[in-house]
């Protein structure tokens, strides 16, 4: 009936809002294993790219710049959400971050893949809060749900990206899937409450609000050291 249909649509919308940027474990993990996300089903930018095509490309990761590999994904919906995009890069570079089957053993009660990846890195003593390098993972907490307002539990990891550069002023540039689109953002831990300095972005907003607490440095949860 009509009421039942409306309730289903409301539930569907709430699922999108709650689980964007997270993923659920799969009994049959594939490479790349994109996040289970309602928006991924409408993702036309990446749907035709196969894992074989990713693995066969000739990009050299020696300098961890990732070169043109990232450029072609900017402003697309690749991966569906943040951890889905990390999985694409992980597959391309032959499990440089993790083995997908192993990650399935690290999911917490909340069921987010970004948190599962963090849990795995923490178990291997690979979480650090300083001296990032190009190619390292970068984790953020409390970007979803009730944690947005409280922002107290720094291990409530809800978002993940990849470091692409460390600038002279120690601003960290990273690439991630934010709001369903691949973008570059910035974080500077020495200027936590600064968004812009002149026309230069110092800290990007990783939560949709204009408060300084929503800037990247104030939601930072740690770096995951890459191989």
Enumerate the predicted regions with their spans:
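Bacterial N-terminal signal peptides that target proteins for export
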Residues: 2-11
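Bacterial N-terminal signal peptides
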Residues: 12-21
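Hydrophobic, Leu/Ile/Phe/Ala-enriched alpha-helical segments that form helix-helix packing faces
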Residues: 18, 89-90, 161
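Aromatic- and glycine-rich peptidoglycan recognition patches
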Residues: 23-38, 48-54, 148-227
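N-terminal capping segments
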Residues: 24-108, 143, 218-227
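...with weaker cross-activation on analogous glycine-rich loops/strands in unrelated enzymes
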Residues: 101-184
């Amino acid at each position: 009936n009509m009421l039942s249909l409306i309730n289903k649509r409301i539930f569907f919308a709430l699922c999108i809002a709650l689980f964007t940027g997270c993923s659920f474990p799969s009994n049959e993990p594939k490479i790349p294993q994109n996040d289970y996300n309602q928006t991924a089903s409408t993702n036309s930018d990446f749907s035709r790219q196969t894992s074989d095509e990713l693995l066969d490309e000739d990009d050299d990761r020696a300098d961890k710049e990732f070169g043109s590999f990232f450029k072609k994904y900017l402003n697309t919906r690749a991966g569906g959400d943040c951890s889905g995009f990390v999985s694409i890069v992980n597959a391309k570079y032959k499990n440089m971050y993790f083995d997908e089957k192993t990650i399935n053993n690290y999911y917490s009660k909340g069921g987010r893949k970004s948190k599962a990846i963090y849990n795995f890195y923490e178990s291997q003593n690979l979480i650090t809060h300083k001296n990032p390098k190009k190619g390292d993972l970068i984790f953020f907490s409390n970007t979803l749900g009730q944690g947005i307002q409280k922002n107290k539990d720094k291990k409530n990891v809800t978002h993940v990206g990849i470091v692409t550069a460390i600038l002279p002023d120690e601003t960290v540039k990273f690439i991630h899937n934010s709001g369903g689109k691949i973008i570059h953002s910035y974080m500077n831990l020495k200027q936590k409450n600064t968004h812009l300095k002149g026309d230069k972005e110092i800290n990007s907003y990783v939560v949709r609000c204009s408060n300084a607490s929503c800037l990247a440095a104030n939601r930072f949860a740690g770096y995951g050291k890459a191989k």
